[in-house]
UniProtKB/Swiss-Prot annotation:
Naturally occurring in which organism (per UniProt): Salmonella paratyphi C (strain RKS4594)
PROSITE patterns for the chain: PG_MUTASE
Pathway entry: Carbohydrate degradation; glycolysis; pyruvate from D-glyceraldehyde 3-phosphate: step 3/5
GO cellular component, as recorded: cytoplasm
Name recorded for this polypeptide: Probable phosphoglycerate mutase GpmB
A biological process from GO: glycolytic process
Keyword Cytoplasm: no
Binding-site positions, substrate: 8-15, 21-22, 58, 60, 82-85, 104-105, 151-152
Keywords: Glycolysis, Isomerase
Parts of the chain that traverse the membrane: none
């Protein structure tokens, strides 16, 4: 059975400012760096062997800090990037017009092929993160990879493994530097394929990120 750990990046400046990030970027806050260090300590105890990270700056930095603690090599995979939020990226959530908020709601509420102008749909996101996850099955026997990605991307992945629609990720609270675990099992009795063992564990952290206190 293959165990895969999923980690959301540490808190960023735009998380604290409640700005839409998507595939745009902002640096980790001091809190975010500390969160990543705490994940690193946990990753070392979990026996992580590989770190596979989104190639965006906030995930790269989170992965680098984790790697320093557990001594793993890092590879980058653009398929683990956050949902492309198109023209709304860099905007403060509270500044959206009624029309812009309508675009966002269509996307997260499951409207068929809903997307923000210039962005991607939840189905497109689901397809690419599942392709990235499938690549883990090609790792050597005994591997225990840790994937560093983003809130919507990881929520979409966990939701769809559970058999829920991609937009159900809004019902999952995956805080900054939370750890989830999924397993790949082959069984004639239990469900074969990917199963969710845990989601959104923050027992290794001190406190939630600023943007999540307001949800």
């Amino acid at each position: 059975m293959l165990q895969v750990y999923l980690v959301r990046h540490g808190e960023t400046q735009w998380n604290a400012e409640r700005r839409i990030q998507g595939q745009s970027d902002s640096p980790l806050t001091a809190k975010g760096e500390q969160q990543a260090m705490q994940v690193g300590e946990r990753a070392r105890s979990l026996g992580s062997t590989h770190i596979i990270s989104s190639d965006l700056g906030r995930t790269k930095r989170t992965a680098e800090i984790i790697a320093q603690a557990c001594g793993c090599d890092i590879t980058f995979d653009s398929r683990l990037r956050e949902l492309d939020m198109g023209v709304l990226e860099k905007r403060q959530i509270d500044s959206l017009t009624e029309e812009e908020e309508g675009w966002r709601r269509q996307l997260v509420n499951g409207t068929q092929d809903g997307r923000i102008p210039g962005g991607e749909s939840m189905q497109e996101l689901s397809d690419r993160v599942h392709a990235a996850l499938a690549s883990c099955l090609e790792l050597p026997q005994g591997s225990r990879p840790l994937l560093v990605s983003h809130g919507i991307a990881l929520g979409c992945l966990v939701s769809t493994i559970l058999g829920l629609p991609a937009w159900a990720e809004r019902r999952l609270r995956l805080r900054n530097c939370s750890i989830s675990r999924i397993d790949y099992q082959e069984s004639q009795w239990l469900a074969s394929g990917w199963v969710v063992e845990t989601a959104g564990d923050v027992s290794h952290l001190d406190a939630p990120a600023l943007d999540e206190l307001q949800r």
